[in-house]
UniProtKB/Swiss-Prot annotation:
PANTHER family: AMINOACYLASE-1. It comes from Dictyostelium discoideum. It is found in: Cytoplasm. Its main location: cytoplasm. Zn(2+) 2 binds at residues 109, 144, 379. Its EC number is 3.5.1.14. This is Aminoacylase-1.
Length: 408
C-alpha cells in the first residue's frame, strides 16, 4: 500500500508493532527509546523508572487540582512470542492488506491501546486545555509472563506508584466480534496446583494396595467431576442466563508425571509400581467465588493419606470493581459511551491482566480495548486489527478519558 496516503497515527502504530518486545527476550530498551522520543515530540512530561529492574515509562499531564485522585492509563509493551511459520506474513512487519487490516503480534494485545493512550495524551497537551485531575500513563514490561515479571506486579508496591495517587485505572480488555464493546471489571484468579501422591511399591505382577497412582487417580477423578459440573453450567448458561467463561471456574489437568525411568533413557520399568505420582492443574476462579472456601475444597480433594499439594501460582485475594451507581467513575464512563452510541457489555476477564494488581489495592480498574467487529485473536496466529477500528478507538478514548479526568 502507498504509505504516503496513510494516516499518521496508523504509521506510528505500525512502527511500534515492529519493535521486538516479544518474549522470551523482549527488547525493552527499544520500546523505551521509542516512547521517550514520542513524549519529547508531543511535549508530554515523562520519566523512565527502572527500580523494578526493567524500564517502565511514565508520562504525566498535571491537572488543575493535583491533590485529587488521578486517572492512570496503563498498558503493557511486551507481547507473546509468534510462531513465524504459522503466520501468513512476518508477525513483526506490521503488514497491511488492501482493506486496511494490519497484521502483527500485539495489534490487539495490546500495542494498539498503548499507542491510542499516547495519542490521547498528545491531543490533550496540544489542546492547551487544563483538565481538573492529573492524568498518568504507564507503559509497563512483563505482563505476559505473569508472576515472575518485573512489571506492574512489582511496581504497585513501590513508593513511586503510591505517589501517583490513582483513583481509577484503565487497562486492556478484549476485542469484541460483535458491534458491542466489552468492559471488564474483574478477572479470574489463576491458581496452579501441584499434587504429589506417595504410596506403596511392589512388583507389577501383584495386586498392590494403596499405590501412589491409585490415590492420585481418585483425586484427579474428583477434580474432573467438578470440571464437568462447571463446564455444564457454562454450556447451560449460554441458553439460559448468558453465563460466560469468566463466570465459571475452569480446571484443566496440565501436568501428569509417574513411572520409573530406566537409566536416563525414555524407557520405563513397566513392572515396577512407582512410589510417587504427580499431577498439576491450571484452575481459574472467578471473583464471585470465595477463595478461602475454594482452598478448603482443594484440601478436601487432597485429604487422603499420602497426598499433598503445593501452589505453583497462587493469589489469596481477587478483588473486582463494583459497577453500581456508587461508583462515580463507572457512571461517568457509561455516560460518555452512551453519548457516543456505544453499547457496552460488562464481563469478567477469562484470563489474567495487570488490572488484578491494581484492583487488589482497592483501586477500581476497567479493562477496555475499543475494538469491535473484530475476531478475538490475542496470542493467536495472524493477529490483526483494521486501521479504521484503530483510529475510531482513539476517538472513543477521546470521548471517555477527558470526562473521567475532569470528573468532580
Ligand atoms: Zn495483554
Ligand atoms: Zn496477552
Amino acid at each position: 500500500m502507498n504509505s504516503i496516503q496513510e494516516n499518521e497515527h496508523v504509521t506510528v502504530f505500525r512502527e511500534f508493532l515492529k519493535i521486538r518486545t516479544d518474549h522470551p527476550t523482549p527488547d525493552y530498551e527499544s520500546s523505551t527509546k521509542f516512547l521517550v522520543e514520542k513524549a519529547k515530540e508531543y511535549n508530554i512530561p515523562y520519566e523512565v523508572y527502572r527500580e523494578t529492574g526493567t524500564p517502565i515509562v511514565l508520562m504525566k499531564i498535571e491537572g488543575l487540582e493535583p491533590n485529587l485522585k488521578t486517572v492512570l492509563l496503563n498498558s503493557h509493551v511486551d507481547v507473546v512470542p509468534a510462531v513465524h511459520d504459522s503466520w501468513k506474513v512476518d508477525p513483526f512487519s506490521a503488514w497491511k492488506d488492501e482493506s486496511g487490516n494490519i497484521f502483527g503480534r500485539g495489534t490487539q494485545d495490546m500495542k494498539c491501546v498503548c499507542m491510542q493512550f499516547l495519542e490521547v495524551a498528545r491531543r490533550i497537551v496540544q489542546s492547551g486545555q487544563k483538565l481538573k485531575r492529573t492524568l498518568h500513563l504507564s507503559f509497563v514490561p512483563d505482563e505476559e509472563i505473569g508472576g515472575s515479571g518485573k512489571g506492574m506486579e512489582k511496581f504497585v508496591y513501590t513508593e513511586k506508584f503510591r505517589q501517583l495517587n490513582i483513583g481509577l485505572c484503565l487497562d486492556e480488555g478484549l476485542a469484541s466480534p460483535t458491534n458491542d464493546f466489552t468492559v471488564f471489571y474483574g478477572e479470574r484468579a489463576p491458581w496452579w496446583v501441584h499434587i504429589t501422591a506417595v504410596g506403596n511399591a511392589g512388583h507389577g505382577s501383584r495386586f498392590i494396595e494403596g499405590t501412589a497412582i491409585e490415590k492420585l487417580m481418585r483425586t484427579i477423578n474428583k477434580m474432573l467431576a467438578f470440571r464437568q459440573e462447571q463446564f455444564e453450567s457454562l454450556h447451560h448458561g449460554q441458553h439460559e442466563c448468558g453465563k460466560k467463561l469468566g463466570d465459571v471456574t475452569s480446571l484443566n489437568l496440565t501436568v501428569l508425571k509417574a513411572g520409573i525411568p530406566i537409566d536416563h533413557s525414555n524407557n520405563f520399568s513397566y513392572n515396577v509400581i512407582p512410589t510417587q505420582a504427580e499431577a498439576g492443574f491450571d484452575i481459574r476462579i472467578p471473583p464471585t467465588v470465595n477463595l478461602d472456601q475454594f482452598l478448603d475444597q482443594i484440601k478436601e480433594w487432597t485429604a487422603e493419606e499420602g497426598l499433598s499439594f503445593k501452589f505453583a501460582s497462587y493469589i489469596p485475594k481477587n478483588e473486582m470493581t463494583k459497577l453500581d451507581s456508587d461508583n462515580k467513575w463507572w457512571e461517568n464512563f457509561k455516560e460518555s459511551c452512551k453519548k457516543m452510541d456505544i453499547n457496552l457489555v460488562t464481563e469478567i476477564f477469562p484470563a489474567a491482566t495487570d488490572s488484578r494488581f491494581i484492583r487488589n489495592l482497592g483501586i477500581p480498574a476497567f479493562g477496555f480495548s475499543p475494538i469491535n467487529n473484530t475476531p478475538i485473536l490475542l496470542h493467536d496466529h495472524n493477529e490483526f486489527l483494521n486501521e479504521k477500528v484503530y483510529l475510531r478507538g482513539i476517538d472513543i478514548f477521546m470521548g471517555i478519558i477527558p470526562n473521567l479526568v475532569n470528573m468532580e
